[in-house]
Amino acid sequence: MELDLIWILIGLPAAFGLGWLASRLDLRQLRIDNRQAPRAYFKGLNFLLNEQQDKAIDAFIEAVQNDPDTSELHFALGNLFRRRGEYERAVRVHEHLLSRGDLSAADRQRAQNALAKDFVKAGLLDRAEDALRKLEGTSFEGQARLARLAIYERSREWPQAREVATQLEASGEVSFSVRKAHYLCEQARELNAHGDATGAAQLLHNAMTEAPDAPRPRLLLGQLQLNQGQALQACATLSQLFESGSVAAPLAAASLVRAAQAAHQVPSALSLLQQHYAQSPCIDVMDAIVALEKTDANAEQQVRQRYIEHLQKQPSLLAASRWLAGADLGADDTRAPVQKALEQA
């Protein structure tokens, strides 16, 4: 009994000493680990600042291994992988972050946004769209919608693009009316290509309502009406571009000529073209004027004179080539503007 008591008295101090020594060793190891993680982290930053991305990645991997619970290191590493085009590794890093149960709500949103960027950069648009949808209702919602809009435009998914553009407008972003009209125009072209001219015309009317000042819906509608044999309606639609002074009006000049000739509206169309040309000289409008004036008896002489006048107002190689067709270069008063145009071409 006395012997047992002696051993107990001897063992208690020894056990206490061993416990104290073990705790000191654990504390020392913890301090070493904590020093190693920041050291590796700052080493990675140094490499990054010196544009040594390979070494920076190695340093960040070391830091993550030493402190796997540090989310900032994961974000830094994932972003580095994405910048280098190593999208699969970036995806793995950000998916690992999302799998952690202790991640804060803010960091979870950041990781989801980073993962969506990985998919976009990798060209995995379906997975990117799914990842971006999960950001609805977060602080990244606006950015995510813009990214989805870019995806839909890239993949020509016009109804979805229009839906997202409407959401962006409702959330206080800038007006997307012109882009939404463009989506309707693209849908109209697809319908027309499949033989649904009526449906295409309806979409173009909707586009005109969406963006009254956008020139493309009227231009496409006028061309559609012309191709459908509705020359008078086409003439009225295309004339609106010139009456409004649209900068895109010259693009409709050739179609207006065809519509006016088919609808027997040459005098009114010619007057409209001449008024527009007087305000904004343009070779496309001049070509249209010449085309409508060619019915006159002295058409050839008038054509040459028109292009000479245009060369004096707006020297260009294209106008000079129009005049040169069958022209006599002998006269000095005509040679000078032609020469000037050729020199400036």
Model-predicted regions and their roles:
Residues 47, 81, 119, 152, ...:
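Residue at a conserved register position within TPR or TPR-like alpha-solenoid repeats
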